[in-house]
Amino acid sequence: MEGYIGNKNFVDMEAMRYWQFPLNYKKDKKQETYDLIFSGRYVGALKRDGYYQRVIKDDDGNIFMVARDKNVKGEPVDKHEWVPQLRNWFESLPNGTCLIGEIYLPNDEGSRKITSLLGCLKEKCIARQQEQNKFLHFYVFDVCAWKGENYMSKPIEDRIRVLNKINNSIYGNYPYVDFATYYEGAELWDKISEYLAKGLEGVVITRKDCPIYEKRTPARMTIKIKKELSNTIDCFFTGRASAPTKAYTGKQVEEWMYWEDARTGEKFNERLWKKYDEGTTSLMPITKNYYYGWAGSLE
C-alpha cells in the first residue's frame, strides 16, 4: 500500500514535536541547559531555519515528501515534485526508507521563505528557484526507517550510527543534500556558541535513550535551544568564558560532593568531609564548575 513500510504508514504518521522551555519557566534555563549538556546523557545537532519534511520511499518504491502539518482536509501533502534537484537522490534511496529533515535555503534561511516557495504551484516553485539561482536543500537529521527496518523505537544513539552509515555511503554524496553532525559534552557546548554567534537557528539536544515519538515528546527528552533564548543563554553568543574558581569556600562543606587530592590531582565525587577534617590527607574541597571543567563565568 502507498506510504507503508512494513505495517506502518509513514506518510500519514504524526510528526515528532520537540520540547522547549516554556516562556514562563521559573528556573534558570541557562544553568539547566548547561548541566544537561555536560551530564553525558545528551547529544545535539544544528537546527536549520527551514521547514520540516519527511522523505519516504515505501515498500513499493513510491516517493513522498510530506510536511509536519496536513491540509484543511486532514490529508498529508506530497511535495517531492517541487524539488526536482533532489529527484536523483530520491530515486537512489532503497525501498523502505523514511528520513526526517528540513528543507532550507543555504545562506538565506527562514521558514517563511520555504513555506512561500512550497506553497506555490509546482511549476512556479521550480521557476522561482531557477530564476533566483537559489535551490532548496534537504538537511537530514533523523531516520525512521532504512531498507525496510523500522528504527522508531531505537534510541537516538543507534539512529545516529545508521545516519552516519548512510551519509558515508553513496546516498550522502548527492548535491543539495546534507546530513546532521551530532556532538556531545564540551564539543556540543562550543558548537551551540558557534552556531548562534553566526546567526543560525539553534540546536536540538536529545537524550541518548530517546526514541522517535509521534506528536509531542516528554519534557527534556528533546530540547530546542534557539536564538530567541539569547537573553537567557547569552554565553552561546560570545563563546567566551573565564576559568572556574578552584577552591570551594561555601558553608556546606560537610555535605560537599566535589573534592580533589591536591597532591595527585585526582578528583572525587563523594562526601569526604570526615577524611578532610581528620587533617591526614591532601584533600581539598573544589567547586562544582572546577570538578566538571565548566566555565567560571559566562560572557
Per-region residue spans from a language model:
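Nucleic-acid 5′ end/cap handling module spanning
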Residues: 2-11, 16-70, 146, 164-299
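Covalent nucleotidyltransferase
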Residues: 34-171
